[in-house]
Amino acid sequence: MLFKQWNDLPEPKHLLDLPEISKNLQSLEVCPVPKVEFPQDLDVPQYSTAVITTKIMNPLFPKNLLQLTSIGEIKTTLTVKSPSLPQSSGKHSWNYDENFPNEVDPDQKNDTADETVYGFSFPIYSFGKTLLFSMEENFISISPIFGNMISRSIISQLAQFSPDIIVIGTSDKIASMKVMTENECTLQPPEFITGFIGSVLTQLIVGPSKGLKFKCLVAPSEGPNGFEKLSLSDMGSLVDLCGQWLGFEPSRYSEECYRLWRCDSAAIGAQSGLYI
């Protein structure tokens, strides 16, 4: 039997001696993490309940009916620095721009590092004795690291005063509505929760502030984070449970929630159409 050497990828015929642009050639590099600014003047002890949810659940909290009041916002910033290029060890005997027109000549690069700042802010609302944290998820423009750091900041602040915590979210990896507490998990493998709500539950269950009492309501959905679609039956269950947990008037509250959900087109089948 003859064994012949072969490669998955063909080797190039010509190898160019390109100068090293980066000092660190390893795959793992130390990267910055977002900084979260929590409102300093927020008086958390005066609230007995804290609701943590995402923007897709905003129809559950009608502004006019509940008289929502904006009391601050959570700001998060991420500063990314472009490292300065290393100094060249010698002069080239050829023209750099001619051989590498799309590359940057290290000899002509300034020593100063460029900084790029990414920032997002999310409002905090209140109604009665309840705080409302509503995080906007968008897998296109907002990295998951922002949600992870925001959830850590929120739970660490609430852990100092231990209010009743209610978490409301969605997941496309569950088959039916799930109600969970600190002592009971109704998820059945391979069901799981991701995104901002998954990060919040992680902080409540295994994070530094674990042990807090909470109730969690997760509805099945379709679509990526930030663009979820819910069924009308699941919306009815959400409205009933939220109205029961928060003590809202059933008839008027449910009517307003359904109206807002249809306006936001968050319901599967709320707006029927035909793809052409």
Swiss-Prot record:
GO terms for cellular component: cytoplasm. The keyword Chaperone applies. It holds the Pfam family POC1. It comes from the Eukaryota. Gene3D superfamilies: POC1 chaperone. It is found in: Cytoplasm. InterPro entries: Pba1_sf (IPR038605), Psome_chaperone_1_fun (IPR018855). Its main location: cytoplasm. Involved in 20S proteasome assembly. Present with 1350 molecules/cell in log phase SD medium. This is Proteasome chaperone 1. It comes from Saccharomyces cerevisiae (strain ATCC 204508 / S288c) (Baker's yeast). The lineage of its organism: Eukaryota, Fungi, Dikarya, Ascomycota, Saccharomycotina.
